């Protein structure tokens, strides 16, 4: 049974891990292998982000990942590519600050698709909300090296601000590791993304289990 948009967005509002592909850091494993391990370990949101492949390769990978996410009842969010999102029937698209504005993308995709926007500042958060984004990516919380030109860390203070004032769900991202995850949760984040910590792990399933344990222990406390 397919989820309504509101049910999908509930995943962003709850304590959750937001999975992200990053083949460059995956120790020789393919995006498909990594996504399968994430889904088998209970991750319900997958963002396909791949900057250095041809459009044809991205399309073919996305089709495979879409099938996997359907099997596991998970969401697929496509980074940057509005057309690719539509072609593979993904659940939504994630836009960077250099991409098209969310309000213009909404005109193309309509109300049923989820639109996320990367943000680094309070002004960008407020603009994303104003433009009708469904959620934001907030970061990098700590120093991060997954992007070619990383933004300076925004720190836990910004996470605290978003937890209090942001009117839509946010995903804390950037430099989050097993050892500092609890600090991010304490600052008010619920949905978190640990990119290289997961994809670069020797044992992805075991790593995700440890992360879930930290999240569940925090929820109980």
Curated annotation (Swiss-Prot):
Entry note: cofactor: Binds 1 Mg(2+) ion per subunit.
NCBIfam families per UniProt: thiE
Required cofactor(s): Mg(2+)
Function as written in the Swiss-Prot or TrEMBL entry: Condenses 4-methyl-5-(beta-hydroxyethyl)thiazole monophosphate (THZ-P) and 2-methyl-4-amino-5-hydroxymethyl pyrimidine pyrophosphate (HMP-PP) to form thiamine monophosphate (TMP).
Binding site for Mg(2+): 80, 99
Positions bound to 4-amino-2-methyl-5-(diphosphooxymethyl)pyrimidine: 47-51, 79, 118, 147
Catalyzed reactions per annotation: 2-[(2R,5Z)-2-carboxy-4-methylthiazol-5(2H)-ylidene]ethyl phosphate + 4-amino-2-methyl-5-(diphosphooxymethyl)pyrimidine + 2 H(+) = thiamine phosphate + CO2 + diphosphate; 2-(2-carboxy-4-methylthiazol-5-yl)ethyl phosphate + 4-amino-2-methyl-5-(diphosphooxymethyl)pyrimidine + 2 H(+) = thiamine phosphate + CO2 + diphosphate; 4-methyl-5-(2-phosphooxyethyl)-thiazole + 4-amino-2-methyl-5-(diphosphooxymethyl)pyrimidine + H(+) = thiamine phosphate + diphosphate
Superkingdom to which the source organism belongs: Bacteria
Entries under Pfam families matching the protein: TMP-TENI
HAMAP family named in the record: TMP_synthase
Keywords carried by this UniProt record: Magnesium, Metal-binding, Thiamine biosynthesis, Transferase
InterPro entries (UniProt xref): Aldolase_TIM, ThiamineP_synth_sf, ThiamineP_synth_TenI, TMP_synthase
Organism: Caldicellulosiruptor saccharolyticus (strain ATCC 43494 / DSM 8903 / Tp8T 6331)
GO cellular component: cytoplasm
GO MF terms, alphabetically ordered: magnesium ion binding; thiamine-phosphate diphosphorylase activity
Family as reported in the entry's similarity comment: Belongs to the thiamine-phosphate synthase family.
E.C. designation(s): 2.5.1.3
The protein's name: Thiamine-phosphate synthase
Pathway per the UniProt entry: Cofactor biosynthesis; thiamine diphosphate biosynthesis; thiamine phosphate from 4-amino-2-methyl-5-diphosphomethylpyrimidine and 4-methyl-5-(2-phosphoethyl)-thiazole: step 1/1
Residues that, per the record, bind 2-[(2R,5Z)-2-carboxy-4-methylthiazol-5(2H)-ylidene]ethyl phosphate: 144-146, 175, 195-196
Membrane-traversing stretches: none
GO BP terms, alphabetized: thiamine biosynthetic process; thiamine diphosphate biosynthetic process
């Amino acid at each position: 049974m397919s989820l309504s948009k509101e049910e999908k967005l509930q995943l962003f509002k709850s304590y959750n891990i937001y999975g992200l592909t990053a083949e460059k850091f995956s120790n020789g494993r393919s995006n498909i292998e990594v996504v399968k391990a994430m889904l088998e370990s209970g991750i319900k949101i997958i963002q396909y982000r791949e900057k250095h492949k041809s459009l044809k390769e991205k399309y073919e990978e996305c089709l495979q990942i879409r099938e996997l996410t359907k099997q596991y009842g998970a969401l697929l969010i496509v980074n940057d590519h509005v057309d690719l999102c539509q072609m593979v029937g993904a659940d939504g698209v994630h836009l960077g600050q250099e991409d098209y504005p969310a309000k213009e993308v909404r005109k193309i995709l309509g109300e049923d698709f989820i639109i996320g926007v990367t943000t680094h500042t309070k002004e960008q958060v407020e603009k994303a909300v104003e433009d009708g984004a469904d959620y934001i990516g907030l970061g990098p919380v700590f120093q991060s090296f997954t992007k070619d030109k990383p933004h300076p860390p925004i720190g836990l203070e910004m996470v605290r601000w978003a937890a209090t004032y942001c009117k839509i769900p946010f995903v804390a991202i950037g430099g989050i590791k097993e050892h500092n995850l609890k600090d991010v949760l304490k600052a008010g984040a619920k949905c978190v993304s640990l990119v290289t910590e997961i994809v670069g792990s020797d044992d992805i399933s075991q790593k995700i289990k440890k992360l879930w344990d930290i999240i569940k222990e925090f929820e109980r406390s």
